[in-house]
């Protein structure tokens, strides 16, 4: 995928020009290694393959001896483990490279998808709450957004940029991002500021002055 694939975007990760007065507060993307570990479970899968390799090698060793066990079971299953590891790392790289998370002064935008690009725009007005799950001790984390019930999202389309295991009510998520606490503060403060903005509404009587609603 070349860098020219998204030349139609006015700004990377933004599907259309922002309205006047709206500004970008933060942009980022998942960390590839953390995404491979947390979303693709690369350690678990590799561990399973290594366990199978050791088990099959021991089985062959007991039945056929080392001369058969080492070149067949050991080499074959270790090679399979390496292939699984490489494939998952490649998938994590593709997903992390294609994704751009954006926080503006009015909304959250997720441009995701390695093969098919999809953009989710979530205004602050439909976000009911957010949660931060810390990953390790280096500041990485996942920020999940719980929306109003009338805004339905697809877990399959969102994944891996979704809160893990929330299938019935999927939640979009900034997955495996660095400086997650800092980003959570930016998001929280921006959403609070937007929701506290006074709104100008028309007075019910014709010719009356505009009223300001808090």
UniProtKB/Swiss-Prot annotation:
- Judging by the UniProt lineage, the source's domain of life is Bacteria
Taxonomic placement:
Bacteria, Pseudomonadati, Pseudomonadota, Alphaproteobacteria, Rhodobacterales
Q: What is this protein called?
A: Uncharacterized 23.7 kDa protein in puhA 5'region
- Pfam families for the chain: bPH_2 (PF03703)
């Amino acid at each position: 995928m070349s860098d020219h694939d998204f030349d139609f975007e006015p700004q990377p990760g933004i599907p259309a020009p922002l309205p006047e007065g709206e500004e970008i507060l933060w942009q980022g993307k998942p960390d590839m290694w953390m995404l491979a570990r947390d979303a693709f479970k690369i350690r678990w899968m590799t561990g399973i393959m290594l366990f199978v390799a050791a088990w099959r090698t021991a089985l062959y060793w007991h039945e056929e001896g080392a001369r058969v066990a080492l070149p067949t079971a050991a080499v074959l299953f270790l090679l399979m483990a390496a292939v699984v590891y490489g494939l998952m790392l490649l998938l994590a790289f593709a997903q992390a490279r294609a994704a751009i998370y954006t926080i503006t002064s009015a909304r959250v935008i997720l441009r995701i998808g390695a093969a098919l690009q999809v953009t989710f725009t979530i205004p602050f007005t439909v976000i009911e709450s957010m949660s931060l799950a810390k990953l390790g001790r280096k500041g990485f984390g996942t920020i999940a957004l719980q929306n109003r019930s009338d805004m339905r999202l697809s877990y399959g389309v969102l994944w891996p940029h979704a809160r893990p295991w929330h299938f019935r009510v999927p939640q979009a998520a900034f997955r495996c991002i660095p400086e997650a606490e800092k980003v959570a503060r930016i998001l929280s403060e921006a959403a609070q500021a937007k929701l506290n903005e006074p709104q100008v509404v028309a007075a019910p009587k014709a010719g009356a002055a505009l009223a300001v609603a808090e």
